[in-house]
Amino acid sequence: MSRTRIAVGVCVATIATASLASVSNAASTKFTAAMSGAQEVPTKGDAKTTGKATITVTGKKLCYTIVVRNLSGVPQAGHIHSGMKGKAGPVFVTLFGKPKAPKKSKLSGCVSATASQIKAISAKPSAYYVNVHTKEYPNGALRGQLKKS
């Protein structure tokens, strides 16, 4: 009986170690989006604002860096929306929802995403876009479609 317990213990330890190793060695997938106010629909965003979003997915963690130029106003929220180019769509993943520092040009952080969200974005990144909202542009100051990089 004690040999059985030892064998079971060794198996459990081996499986746990392998599971932890696979989580820590999870491959990352990177997506980018060239952003501008002109891409916002149905109303245009901030005409002079441009930017670039980089989204890195590792497991269920989604990390973002959004660099914006000439943004008028304080970033209030950032999202990934579902929607093809030229179409507005609902929020799919909230990146941030609290105001950032005034005129902050680099927005970054990490959020959790569900397996189904990650799978959907990975399957067809062009069906999703990143946008940043300000008080002046509550529907979005700038936007860019995702693409795998």
Predicted regions and their residues:
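Metal-centered catalytic cores of metalloenzymes
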Residues: 2-78, 82-149
